[in-house]
Amino acid sequence: MHKYDVVVVGGGHAGCEAATAAARLGASTLLITHKISTIGEMSCNPAIGGVAKGVVVREVDALDGIMGRAIDRASIHSVVLNGSRGAAVWGPRAQADRKLYKKAIQEIILNYNNLTVKEESVDDFLIESDSNGESYIKAVITDSGERILTSRVVLTTGTFLRGVIHIGEQTTPSGRIGDKPAIELANTLKKYDFKLGRLRTGTPPRLDRGTINWSVLQEQVGDNPPTPFSYLTEKINQPQVSCFITHTNEHTHRVIRENLHRSASSYLDNVIAPRYCPSIETKVKKFAEKNNHQIFLEPEGIDDNTIYPNGISNSLPIEVQYEMIKSIKGLENAEILRPGYAVEYDYIDPRELFHTLETKKVKGLYFAGQINGTTGYEEAAGQGIIAGINAALSLSQKSFVLHRTDSYIGVMIDDLVTKGITEPYRLFTSRAEYRLAIRSDNADRRLTQKGYDISLVSHERYSVLQGKLKSIKQLEEKLESLTITPEQLRSYGIKISYDGIRKTALDLLGYPNIDWNKLREIWPELNMGSSVSYLHNAKAPLPVIQVADTGIQYLNDDGMDAVDTEKNVDSSVMCWNNTITDSIAKNEIYEAVAIEAKYKPYLVRQEADMKFLQEEVNTQIPTNFNYSQIKGLSTEVIEKLQSIKPATIGIAKQIQGITPAAIVSILVYLRNKKTKIAANSA
């Protein structure tokens, strides 16, 4: 009978991060998966990252996770979403070559120290109770009846728990097309009294590249040079490809409307789908006034003929999918290689978990990924690494918890275990009240030291961080040594407060309209070095919460983050001296120093605003309060608040999907209304 310190069930994005994290901490780890050949499979879209999601990938990488390095070995189209806005909303995203990504993950997993991989299914657990009645894991039981002894299990089942695929009226028990579901394991969880719910998601049809008329489509070129995800990657080596854009039209919508009754969405109304990744059927129904919807045609590989049409996920019958596709510009002759489908599956109530992702019912049992009600590769990876870390650390009675103040992973896990979910959970910057501090550019500076302190992070990664921190300090000290008076600044066309106080170059860099080129004009000794690019024209950080105004103004009304793929680049920024080593990208150092300088005053205000929120938790909300009269609240927020009718701000904060921005907007509205009433009665 075999015995392992940690057993991870499931070889998806959560499982791979959990298994490698536990192994890095020295735990003898077993990864059990249905098929070794599908480890690292990108089941839905062939891309990693995005707004908020890209930050999570960087955070996983900062903890020595594997997703960032794998996507860097597979990236074929890279873009920084929101690149022309403040760094707090930058969203690195990379289109992947599916084969290269899977190959990269498998090469890492199958050659990892302390990690064994086994091809089998887990159907049951051996759970015992101690004298206090506390249940704990003793073993996992496979479908062949084998017992594998372990005291720590991480369950990362994805969409496989009682998974069912729907294509029109046809249904097939499956967790992913071509793969069987985990029926017995779902029954086991039910047997041990875990509260199960049902969710669904979907995927679009895959198209044949050679049957698409590319000449009539809008080309979307990626960033040049492409931006790596991993802090250990110097550059992306794969050839880069373009994506293309087309749109649905009235004919497309008519085809969909006439066949809605044949879609799985018509009989799965009680099974909630992702709000922010809706099917084309949902878009046509919910946004009937829209004449078209955008579709991104994304290549699935450099030498792969498969095209992923992002934006038309559906579960219509195959013949209807053909009719729909052929109504779209450029796709008139397109052939479908694989139909789109919906998949419904079980999830557990994440409120049954601690912040370590250990279950409250069974000691030593951890859940990570879509089983917790989340959606997305990145969210799964973020949970997986935390579950794997804690499974290993708990063997010596230790734990590792990230917080809302230090990471998006911390925001996500706190949301899940305290608020639960009512629909598939997806990360947005609007969910993070400390988003000005937890950005994509500083994940290593936030988390790598924490990982190193628990022996999770390699010496190589830690050395890279130390070199980077040293270079940042050197540059900041250089800038602080250069001073100038407000009077002298006027000769350079810079007008600031005429207070007679000398300003350092670092002070000036914090001003919205002062960049590196302006500093070089003032101080020629900041001479040109090797050419590097710097996002110096990116907009200054937008104002953080203003409690005297109307709440947070820089979040979208629909609760999602705006996507802006434009990035302003200046390739002629200087390097002030040669002490910044060649092994550290000089543009990273300049970027880090400038961002910190520009965000410094806003971070101070952010702290004050968060303190304000904490102090106002007992503020009463009128019973029949009309939330729709508050500008800036999303439809989701209004619906939930009108339904639940929270009595206080503190209760409203605990509702799943209610963002910090929404809470501030409500507080400001109530306070302004109270002030008006007082003024009128005076």
Curated annotation (Swiss-Prot):
Q: Name one GO molecular function term.
A: flavin adenine dinucleotide binding
Q: Which Gene3D superfamilies match?
A: FAD/NAD(P)-binding domain (3.50.50.60), GidA associated domain, C-terminal subdomain (1.10.150.570), tRNA uridine 5-carboxymethylaminomethyl modification enzyme MnmG/GidA (1.10.10.1800)
User: What keywords sit in the KW lines?
Assistant: Cytoplasm, FAD, Flavoprotein, NAD, tRNA processing
Which co-factor is required? FAD
Which residues does FAD bind?
A: G10, G11, G12, H13, A14, G15
User: In terms of domain of life, where is this protein from?
Assistant: Bacteria
Its cellular-component GO annotations read: cytosol
Q: Where does NAD(+) bind?
A: 273-287
Q: Please name the GO terms of the biological process aspect recorded for this protein, alphabetically.
A: tRNA methylation; tRNA wobble uridine modification
> What are the subcellular locations of this protein?
Cytoplasm
Chief location of this protein within or outside the cell: cytoplasm
Among Pfam families, the record links this protein to:
GIDA, GIDA_C_1st, SAM_GIDA_C
UniProt similarity note: Belongs to the MnmG family.
Instruction: Write out the function statement from the record.
Output: NAD-binding protein involved in the addition of a carboxymethylaminomethyl (cmnm) group at the wobble position (U34) of certain tRNAs, forming tRNA-cmnm(5)s(2)U34.
Q: How would you summarize the oligomeric state and partners of this protein?
A: Homodimer. Heterotetramer of two MnmE and two MnmG subunits.
Q: What's the protein called, per UniProt?
A: tRNA uridine 5-carboxymethylaminomethyl modification enzyme MnmG
The species is: Wolbachia pipientis subsp. Culex pipiens (strain wPip)
